[in-house]
């Protein structure tokens, strides 16, 4: 029988990692009104817990409002989130928009509905953020989501592009933040199990998960099993980009490159990989073990 860990032990490293990401990317500032998008999954529940904790202890004042979108999926348990959020004492809005019918009508039989569903959901949430005066929209994407997106774009889109911790929304009127960007999914999952969150299944619509994303996710899980710490190193590499050692002519002027009296880059020197030193230092920031 699997023993459930104490959430009070699992929570502090998660808070520390999220606080570091928030600080590094200046995600939350004085006077912000943060709209937390709550799906009923482990990630968004954990995100809400962390932000409510930081709200009480951070040296700045910011508001937190939880928002859930009921998309009309059959079997959606409408009572779960209102009851949970009421007990928690956090301000919340439940939006009701029947995007399920639209998605079913527009998506061919057998095809995944996730892309269209996501676009419709995003538009509704952006609009609501404007209506309530939210200055930031907080999403529950974590480290593993970011890395899956990176490799999805490389393998199937031929683009070096991931999922940023902070960005301007595509409608140009909102700022989206991902405070869980530094956190591993397995650590969030352990905490969610320990807390016993009332999880709402994400497959109520009957859509099958994206096969390509599932394959990439399994690949990353395999890497981490065989080489613990590899995923954290890949994430860190996204913060240490050297354009002169890539092939993008828009990022680096290869055509204009010429010999100068200044010292050139050390492209032919041996690389140094202080992996263990880095992981040892980071283990104090997030749960890596």
UniProtKB/Swiss-Prot annotation:
More about this protein:
The thiolation reaction likely consists of two steps: a first activation step by ATP to form an adenylated intermediate of the target base of tRNA, and a second nucleophilic substitution step of the sulfur (S) atom supplied by the hydrosulfide attached to the Fe-S cluster.
Q: Give the range the annotation lists for the signal sequence.
A: none
Q: By its UniProt entry, which Gene3D superfamilies does this protein fall under? A: HUPs
- The sequence motif named PP-loop motif is recorded at 39-44
Cofactor requirements of the protein: Mg(2+); [4Fe-4S] cluster
One example GO MF annotation: sulfurtransferase activity
One GO term of the cellular component aspect?
cytoplasm
The record's section on InterPro entries has:
Rossmann-like_a/b/a_fold, TilS/TtcA_N, tRNA_Cyd_32_2_STrfase
Does Nucleotide-binding appear among the keywords?
A: yes
What does the UniProt record say this protein does? Catalyzes the ATP-dependent 2-thiolation of cytidine in position 32 of tRNA, to form 2-thiocytidine (s(2)C32). The sulfur atoms are provided by the cysteine/cysteine desulfurase (IscS) system.
According to its UniProt record, the EC number is 2.8.1.-
Chain's gene name: ttcA
List ligand-binding residues for [4Fe-4S] cluster. Answer: 114, 117, 205
Organism expressing this protein natively: Deinococcus geothermalis (strain DSM 11300 / CIP 105573 / AG-3a)
Specify one Pfam family: ATP_bind_3
What catalytic activity does the UniProt entry give for this protein? cytidine(32) in tRNA + S-sulfanyl-L-cysteinyl-[cysteine desulfurase] + AH2 + ATP = 2-thiocytidine(32) in tRNA + L-cysteinyl-[cysteine desulfurase] + A + AMP + diphosphate + H(+)
Q: Family per UniProt?
A: Belongs to the TtcA family.
Q: How is the cofactor bound?
A: Binds 1 [4Fe-4S] cluster per subunit. The cluster is chelated by three Cys residues, the fourth Fe has a free coordination site that may bind a sulfur atom transferred from the persulfide of IscS.
Q: Which PANTHER family match?
A: AMINOTRAN_5 DOMAIN-CONTAINING PROTEIN, SULFURTRANSFERASE-RELATED
- The name of this protein is tRNA-cytidine(32) 2-sulfurtransferase
The record's top EC class is transferase
Biological classification of the source: Bacteria, Thermotogati, Deinococcota, Deinococci, Deinococcales
By its UniProt entry, which HAMAP family does this protein fall under? TtcA (MF_01850)
């Amino acid at each position: 029988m699997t023993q459930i860990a104490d959430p009070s032990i699992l929570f502090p490293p998660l808070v520390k990692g999220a606080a570091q990401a928030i600080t590094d990317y200046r995600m939350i500032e004085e006077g912000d009104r943060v709209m937390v998008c709550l799906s009923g999954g482990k990630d968004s529940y954990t995100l809400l817990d962390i932000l409510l904790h930081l709200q009480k202890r951070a040296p700045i004042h910011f508001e937190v409002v939880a928002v859930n979108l009921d998309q009309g999926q059959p079997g959606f348990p409408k009572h779960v989130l209102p009851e949970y959020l009421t007990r928690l004492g956090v301000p919340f809005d439940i939006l009701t928009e029947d995007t399920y019918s639209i998605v079913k009508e527009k998506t061919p039989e057998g095809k995944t509905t996730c892309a269209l569903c996501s676009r419709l959901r995003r538009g509704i949430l952006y609009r609501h953020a404007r209506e309530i005066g939210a200055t930031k929209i907080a999403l529950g994407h974590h480290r593993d989501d970011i890395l899956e997106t990176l490799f999805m774009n490389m393998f199937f889109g031929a683009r070096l592009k991931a999922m940023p911790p902070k960005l301007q929304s595509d409608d140009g009127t909102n700022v989206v933040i991902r405070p869980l960007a530094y956190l591993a999914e397995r650590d969030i999952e352990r905490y969610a199990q320990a807390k016993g969150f009332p999880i709402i299944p994400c497959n109520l619509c009957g859509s099958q998960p994206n096969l390509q994303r599932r394959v990439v996710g399994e690949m990353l899980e395999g890497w981490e099993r065989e080489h613990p710490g590899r995923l954290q190193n890949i994430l860190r590499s996204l913060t240490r980009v050297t354009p002169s050692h890539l092939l993008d002519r828009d990022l680096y002027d290869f055509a204009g490159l010429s010999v100068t009296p200044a010292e050139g880059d050390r492209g032919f020197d041996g690389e140094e990989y202080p992996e263990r030193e880095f992981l040892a230092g980071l283990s104090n920031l997030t749960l890596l073990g």
